[in-house]
Amino acid sequence: PAPRGLCRGDKVGPLRPSMCGIAGIFRLPSARGLSAHELGTLVRTVAHRGPDGEGLTYLGTRDGALGEVTAEGDWTVGLGHRRLSILDLSESGRQPMQLGDQPLWISFNGEIYNYLELRAELEALGQTFRSHSDTEVILGAYAAWGTAGIARLRGMWGFMLVDGRRRVAVLSRDRLGIKPLYYRAWDDRLAVGSELKQLLALPGVTARADERALSEYLATGYEDPSRTFFDGLVSLPAGTYAELSLDTLRLSSPASYWAPERVQVTVHDADEAAARLRHVLAEATRIHLRSDVPVGCALSGGLDSSAVVVLVDQLNRREATPAPLHTFTATFPGEAIDERR
């Protein structure tokens, strides 16, 4: 069936959010404050991001090794997650997730589009997987390649990965910063979240303006990628990762794993350029369609979304049982912002 917009009276089921929510607390054994109750607050504050489940994991040192403990135990790492199921809808895909019996845990928001290719590569190296999720592939990539594995990911993400062997937590965001990751640091503890309001919900954190960030934005129109408009609340810059020592809670300076390159492209004529663009766009669209739930498209009156919808429809028609493609348009009749134009 051809793609079409939705009309009044159409029934397509409830609309779902397009994100998960992550939360984390890291603290020294001597730290006071930020208890299991506060981790629950961080998670509940973003309940709207993940309607499909909630998970909490507490980690502490036992016999010299990091492992799971109870909320009432002597924990120093708390990971939380609100789940929106897109890949592997079973309980095997729930988070926070551990990689088998290895001391690697993750809370992840986003989607890794090339997870099937990475999974095949990791299986060739001898790794086995318990789920069909992209989350487990991130853990596997880190186990195989360390932080160098981050550059192999194609997708959008914000995650916290805890490495019990190295006793570090790795925080990372995707190349363009599509998915957010914020944190608030004290001397003896650090809190992480997907949204600023999670951190603002913590005791002792006030919504005080960062006057320097505001003045720089008003003067230049640009934002510092590592700052927010709230004093003390920090954004991890896009395209970077940072390592947090679990023993000292010292956070490294963000390290870039990617930067756009200037590429010299040579084409002989407009037809060749169009063919190459179509190939690249079709390939990107194809891997973005990997999902275990129905996929829809936002459709405005512009060329970008129209081209994507046409490609999605063409790819969909190649399937044995094509699914209806629903498109969504923000319409404001008579207004300049009407997206049908």
Predicted regions, residues:
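Cysteine-centered catalytic environments shared across enzyme families
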Residues: 16-341
